[in-house]
Regions:
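Phosphate-interacting basic helix/loop segments used at nucleotide- and nucleic-acid interfaces
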Residues: 1, 179, 193
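Outer-membrane beta-barrel initiation region
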Residues: 1-169, 229-232
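Gly/Ser/Thr-rich loops at beta-strand to alpha-helix junctions
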Residues: 16-17, 188-191
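Composition- and surface-driven signal marking solvent-exposed, interaction-prone regions
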Residues: 22-25, 185, 196-198, 254
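Transmembrane beta-strand segments that form the barrel wall of outer-membrane beta-barrel proteins
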Residues: 106-118, 143-150, 176-188, 209-217, ...
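Feature captures outer-membrane beta-barrel proteins of Gram-negative bacteria and organelles
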Residues: 127-137, 162-175, 194-214, 236-246, ...
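Outer-membrane beta-barrel proteins
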Residues: 144, 154-156, 192-194, 219-223
Length: 254
């Protein structure tokens, strides 16, 4: 979208496993284009805006004139969680190209469990491979279907059986003023199934995050007698959380 002095673009990284690599490729492509003035790049995740990268016209012109390199552009560009102005500029933009909807990823998660809780054994262990199919649905919607394949363990019962992992449907939403929401239903980890709602707020610089979660879950397990057993008794859980990120030390405090 073109506004006086600024070109606004939204993009989603569907190619590179590293988000930073995808962002870098998008910035490089925009700087090599023939647009004039400043640039605004909205980073999307499953079509939900997450970040806005601002490159003023002085920065883009200095790069195109060979006065600074791409590394210096990264150091001087602005990054904010506030995407409201940029998304307003994109409201009447053309149809998106290569959307993420209905694209499927096959991901394999290695899983190692170690626990020392007995005197007659040094530890109990379990090594699993957890392949998962992850599909982006509509805007903010995602489906995950995972199976747990035991590789080696000295445990018994369910831990030796092929069993379902995370089988869930989630919906992300973004409200104005940096407020995010997520609703997830399905089969979770730690033998729990049910539903969970998350709400969080992030400051513009992304350092502070405040939020809360609430859910209702029941017991879920694979047993020899009942197959996939799903308990009816529900347990209500809720929590409040806060985190702070210190970029100079690359540390996050929860």
């Amino acid at each position: 979208a073109q506004t006086p002095g600024v070109t606004t673009v939204s993009f989603e990284n569907n190619v590179y496993r590293s988000t930073y690599t995808g962002v870098g490729k998008a910035i490089d492509a925009c700087l090599e284009s023939k647009t004039k003035g400043g640039l605004q790049l909205v980073v999307l995740e499953n079509r939900i805006p997450r970040l806005c990268i601002n490159l003023p016209d002085t920065l883009t012109e200095a790069y195109r004139n060979g006065e600074i390199n791409l590394t210096q552009v990264y150091q001087q560009m602005g990054i904010t969680v506030d995407t409201d102005p940029a998304m307003k500029a994109l409201k009447n933009a053309g149809q998106e190209e290569v959307p993420s909807a209905w694209k499927v990823d096959l991901v394999i998660y290695p899983d190692l469990f170690l626990e020392n809780n007995t005197f007659d054994e040094l530890y109990t262990y379990a090594i699993n491979l957890n392949p998962a199919v992850e599909m982006a649905l509509w805007k903010g919607g995602k489906m995950t279907a995972q199976v747990i394949l035991p590789v080696a363990t000295n445990l018994s019962g369910e831990m030796k059986r092929i069993r379902p992992g995370i089988i869930a449907l989630s919906q992300d939403v973004r409200f104005r003023h940096n407020i995010f929401g997520k609703m997830t239903v399905g089969n979770f980890t730690n033998n729990r199934y049910g539903a969970q709602l998350e709400i969080k707020y992030r400051t513009n610089n992304g350092r502070w995050e405040l939020g809360g979660t609430a859910g209702s879950t029941g017991f879920s397990a694979i047993t020899r007698e009942d197959g996939w057993y799903i308990g009816r008794k529900q347990r209500i859980n809720a929590s409040l959380n806060a985190s702070y990120y210190e970029p100079r030390l690359n540390l996050q405090f929860d």
